[in-house]
Amino acid sequence: MNRNDITEKIITTKVAKGITWESVAKKVGLSKEWVTAGCLGQMTFDEKQAKVVGKIFGLTAEEQKWLQVVPYKGSLPTPVPTDPLIYRWYEIVSVYGTTIKELIHEEFGDGIMSAIDFSMDIVRQPDPKGDRVNVVLSGKFLPYKTY
């Protein structure tokens, strides 16, 4: 058994029972974005959170322990994503990455945007021409230091 097996069980149970990520997040008491990432194997749950997730998805005590193991983050099955939605993000970074970098450096100086001290919010934005996906990424700016 490994973390991928637990993720597959969570997804299978989610589909079979019609569970939503938002309902899981409410029971865990955290954002739907973070909890979804955790259920998909990209974040580490603490013991209390793992028990809540375990109860929702019918996980054994051993399976709940796997939710508490630090995962190998950013583990997509291929270097260039093939899923169309994920590929759009790859494309966005390919096209706009240098622009984002330049504008962040112009505003903040030389450094990076943290993906650790980070939050994300995904909401539906109604639009008469077709609903839009509104994604807000908020990461702490971390300046490079001289030494």
Swiss-Prot record:
Keyword field contains Isomerase: no
**Which Gene3D superfamilies does the record match to this protein?**
Cyanate lyase, C-terminal domain (3.30.1160.10), lambda repressor-like DNA-binding domains (1.10.260.40)
> This protein's superkingdom?
Bacteria
UniProt KW keywords: Lyase
Q: Which Pfam families match?
A: Cyanate_lyase, CYNS_N
- Give the EC class as a word: lyase
An example Gene Ontology molecular-function term? cyanate hydratase activity
Q: Which reaction does it catalyse?
A: cyanate + hydrogencarbonate + 3 H(+) = NH4(+) + 2 CO2
Checking InterPro entries in the record gives:
Cyanase (IPR008076), Cyanate_lyase_C (IPR003712), Cyanate_lyase_C_sf (IPR036581), CYNS_N (IPR048564), Lambda_DNA-bd_dom_sf (IPR010982)
Leader sequence residues: none
Q: Which GO BP terms apply?
A: cyanate metabolic process
Per the UniProt entry, the Enzyme Commission number(s) are 4.2.1.104
Q: Which HAMAP family match?
A: Cyanate_hydrat
NCBIfam families xref list? cynS, PRK02866.1
Q: Which family does it belong to?
A: Belongs to the cyanase family.
Q: Relate the protein's function as given in its record.
A: Catalyzes the reaction of cyanate with bicarbonate to produce ammonia and carbon dioxide.
Q: What is this protein called?
A: Cyanate hydratase
The organism of origin for this protein: Polaromonas sp. (strain JS666 / ATCC BAA-500)
The upper taxonomy is: Bacteria, Pseudomonadati, Pseudomonadota, Betaproteobacteria, Burkholderiales
